[in-house]
Swiss-Prot record:
One GO CC term on file: cytoplasm
GO molecular function: translation release factor activity, codon specific
Chief localisation class: cytoplasm
Upper taxonomic lineage: Bacteria, Pseudomonadati, Pseudomonadota, Gammaproteobacteria, Oceanospirillales
Residue numbers carrying N5-methylglutamine: 237
Protein name: Peptide chain release factor 1
Record family assignment: Belongs to the prokaryotic/mitochondrial release factor family.
Post-translational changes noted in the entry: Methylated by PrmC. Methylation increases the termination efficiency of RF1.
Role according to the record: Peptide chain release factor 1 directs the termination of translation in response to the peptide chain termination codons UAG and UAA.
PROSITE patterns hit by this protein: RF_PROK_I (PS00745)
């Protein structure tokens, strides 16, 4: 292990012990904000420190095995060789785990997300496919025990959506879904196709971390144009009685958001403000990523919504993620919400990129 990494781990271990002591101090316990901040930091450090302690114990075991290897008794010597080999293998494995734990954390990973799915090329079939994608993400959210709230939706003429925007609430939602942004392509025979020909359609997906307008991004009220209108769609007689739907226009950037799913204008406005903050933040992040990509192109994490990232081929039952050349012949399971078989390899690839960069920096 590099000396710089070892010193970093020792420093984190000292901080962990310090926090353990602080969390027992009466003044800290009385200060809820401070107690919460220390508790969060302590919880984040715990897996790193535990792994480092295990790593140090293995180092001690290896040293003991080396002593056994010098023993005159051949049985003890043989046992020492076996323990030495096992210790080295464990040490190498733990070293990789520790390096991953030390990778810079995305501050947005624990946030809720706004998910946008839009029909692209392909007409009605693209709208139907956008409905399939939204259902896929909704089912995946169920498996993660996340909550899905539709913010706005524009139905397709023959099913699905021209556009659907949803808020997904749950721990780690962004960390799991952030690599889904991009163009998703489908190849299949549409239900409306009488000749049995395979058509290609596409949808774009955008995943944005939910921003707290107050804490994360400042929006001047003077920069907003606020319009109210009557909600369309489900809702019974209520939709014809009040202008509960909200449209916000951010004048400096031209970004427009709508929310009409809640019956209360106040709730629609709050959701629209949150979505607007996330859109503005996403635009800033996209700009920064674009500038950064001129020096170093990230294979997985670019998040460019125009980039073709995945193809769903129904006749072959195949899903291909083009960023990491991963092909899985389990389309039915994936569109039913079993996304981890795609998400986990993407996360692993992204971490491998980070590790390579970390090695280069050191």
């Amino acid at each position: 292990m590099k000396e710089s990494i070892k010193l970093k781990l020792e420093s984190l271990s000292d901080r962990y012990d310090e926090l353990a002591a602080l969390l027992g101090v009466a003044e800290v316990i009385m200060d809820q904000d401070l107690f919460r901040a220390y508790s969060k930091e302590y919880a984040e450090l715990e897996p790193v420190v535990k792994c480092f302690n295990e790593f140090q114990q293995i180092d001690e075991n290896i040293a003991e095995a080396e002593l056994m290897m010098t023993d005159a008794d051949p049985d003890i010597k043989e046992m020492g060789v076996e323990e030495y080999k096992a210790g080295l293998a464990q040490k190498e494995e733990l070293q990789l785990v520790l390096q991953k734990l030390l990778l810079p954390k995305d501050p947005n990973d624990s946030r809720n997300v706004f998910l946008e799915v839009r029909a692209g090329t392909g007409g009605d079939e693209a709208s139907i496919f956008s409905g399939d994608l939204f259902r896929m993400y909704s089912r995946y959210a169920e498996t993660q025990r996340w909550k899905v709230e539709i913010v706005s939706a524009s139905d397709g003429e023959h099913g699905g959506y021209k556009e659907v925007i949803a808020r997904i609430v749950g721990e780690g939602a962004y960390s799991k879904l952030k690599f889904e942004s991009g163009a998703h392509r489908v190849q299949r025979v549409p239900a409306t196709e009488s000749q049995g020909r395979i058509h290609t359609s596409a949808c774009t997906v955008a995943v944005m971390p939910e921003m707290d307008e107050v804490d994360d991004i400042i929006i001047n009220k003077s920069d907003l144009r606020i319009d109210t209108f009557r909600a369309s769609g489900a809702g019974g007689q209520h939709v014809n009685k009040t202008d509960s739907a909200i449209r916000l226009t951010h004048i400096p950037t031209g970004v427009v958001v709508e929310c009409q799913e809640e019956r209360s204008q106040h709730k629609n406005r709050a959701k629209a403000m949150s979505l607007l903050a996330s859109r503005l933040q996403a635009a800033e992040l996209e700009k920064a990523a674009s500038e950064q990509s001129e020096t170093r192109k990230s294979l997985v994490g670019s998040g460019d919504r125009s980039e073709r990232i995945r193809t769903y081929n129904y006749p072959q039952g195949r899903v291909t993620d083009h960023r990491i050349n991963l092909t899985l012949y389990k389309l039915d399971e994936i569109v039913a919400g079993e996304l981890d078989s795609l998400i986990n390899p993407l996360v692993n690839e992204f971490q491998a990129e980070q590790l390579a960069a970390l090695s280069g920096d050191n």
